[in-house]
Amino acid sequence: MAVTTSMSFNLMASFRGMSLSSSSSSSFFKGEFGPSSLRLPNKSPLSVSPFPLTIESAHKKGAGSTKNGRDSKGQRLGVKIYGDQVAKPGAIIIRQRGTKFHPGKNVGIGKDHTIFALIDGLVKFEKYGPDKKKVSVYPREIQPENPNSYRARKRENFRLQREKKKARREGYSFQPQLILASAATDNADESAVC
């Protein structure tokens, strides 16, 4: 009951400003529109807009489709073994789409442009032409270690600690001995060169 009264009140409010007198009605039906023939109604706060409030878009899947907003997972492309790192035979060096990197020495290329190592060695990235890059694998050359390097000194220090600990467990007191590398001679003056 209350709904029908409010709707009738809205209709009355929308037609309040229109007047259809005998003089203006004939001109209205003839198609003559003027300021005297048609007066627009005053806007009231209770009036209903002529268009429904719907949001439309040009495409069927624009707003709230369940098929929207999805993305495929990443393809895990890129460099897998970097320069100056060791690669074993068959190890994948680069996964790529197209040939961003071209194969060099001792590497192969798969049908999906994956570059892989053919031999055991170090990976090197090289320039190839003005704007291309080439990947090669070179055999690893093992260089002798410097005895004065930090790694060698540290290894020797840990070896001495293990020997001391082992000697303590056995009850033997370990005393490091100094050994001179020079030959033992009776006359030190004869061998000295000044």
UniProtKB/Swiss-Prot annotation:
Statement: the UniProt record of this protein carries the keyword Ribonucleoprotein: yes
NCBIfam families named in the record: L27
PANTHER family: LARGE RIBOSOMAL SUBUNIT PROTEIN BL27M, RIBOSOMAL PROTEIN L27
Keywords, ordered alphabetically: Chloroplast, Plastid, Ribonucleoprotein, Ribosomal protein, Transit peptide
The species this protein was found in: Spinacia oleracea
Any one GO molecular-function label of the UniProt entry: structural constituent of ribosome
GO cellular component: chloroplast; ribonucleoprotein complex; ribosome
Subcellular location: Plastid, Chloroplast
Pfam families cross-referenced by the UniProt entry: Ribosomal_L27 (PF01016)
Main location: plastid
Family, similarity comment: Belongs to the bacterial ribosomal protein bL27 family.
UniProt entry tagged with the keyword Ribonucleoprotein: yes
Summary of the function given for this chain in its UniProt record: Component of the chloroplast ribosome (chloro-ribosome), a dedicated translation machinery responsible for the synthesis of chloroplast genome-encoded proteins, including proteins of the transcription and translation machinery and components of the photosynthetic apparatus.
Gene3D superfamilies named among the record's database cross-references: 2.40.50.100
Subunit structure: Component of the chloroplast large ribosomal subunit (LSU). Mature 70S chloroplast ribosomes of higher plants consist of a small (30S) and a large (50S) subunit. The 30S small subunit contains 1 molecule of ribosomal RNA (16S rRNA) and 24 different proteins. The 50S large subunit contains 3 rRNA molecules (23S, 5S and 4.5S rRNA) and 33 different proteins.
Extent of the transit peptide: 1-57
GO terms for biological process, alphabetical: translation
Region annotation (Disordered) ranges: 57-76
Official protein name in the record: Large ribosomal subunit protein bL27c
